[in-house]
Regions:
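Alpha-helix C-capping/helix-to-loop hinge sites
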Residues: 15-18, 38, 90
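A short gly/proline-enriched turn/hairpin at secondary-structure junctions
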Residues: 36-47, 58-62
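Secondary-structure boundary/capping signal
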Residues: 23, 35, 64-67
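Hydrophobic pocket/interface hotspot
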Residues: 15, 26-28, 35, 48, ...
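Acidic side chains
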Residues: 20-23, 39, 76, 104
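Generic secondary-structure boundary/loop-capping signal
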Residues: 34, 43, 95-97
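A beta-strand edge to alpha-helix "cap/lid" segment located at domain peripheries
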Residues: 2, 7, 53-134
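Short, low-complexity N-terminal intrinsically disordered segments enriched in polar/charged residues
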Residues: 1-33
Length: 134
């Protein structure tokens, strides 16, 4: 079972900072092979390591700058869950900026990896999100 600080580290220091660094391996190492990531408001859904890898290759490749920051985390150690509210600034290769304040809900499995990630975004998502979605 992960402690409070370990849950925050997994979400912020590994998952989000991995995205900021465009580090595909770092991001993928936070998720179980059967992880489900979904965007309820956008109908995007990625199930399993292969779909998630395709998604993150697309996402990281579509944005020259990714900046997740200003995290507020609520942790439930008993359920191995974390809610993270944050700002994210994305800049595509043409210089178009997208600024959002989003909320992710993370649920971990017994191995201390994300088994489910639920993402609530404040703006419509276009490029970087279609690949890998079923």
């Amino acid at each position: 079972m992960l402690a409070r600080d370990e849950l925050i580290k997994l979400a912020v220091d590994e998952y989000f900072i991995g995205c900021n660094k465009h580090d595909h391996s770092m991001v993928m190492s936070t998720m179980s092979d059967d992880c489900l990531m979904r965007f309820p408001a956008a109908s995007f859904r990625y199930l399993g390591a292969q779909a998630l890898s395709i998604h993150f290759t697309d996402f990281l490749g579509n944005f020259s700058d990714i900046n997740f920051h200003d995290f507020v985390n609520i942790v439930d150690v008993e359920s191995q869950s974390l809610v993270s509210y944050f700002k994210v600034f994305l800049t595509d290769h043409e210089g178009v900026e997208i600024k959002m304040q989003n909320c992710n809900i993370f649920h971990c499995n017994e191995d201390g990896l994300f088994k489910e990630i639920i993402i609530y975004n404040t703006k419509a998502l276009d490029k970087g999100f279609h690949e890998g979605s079923d």
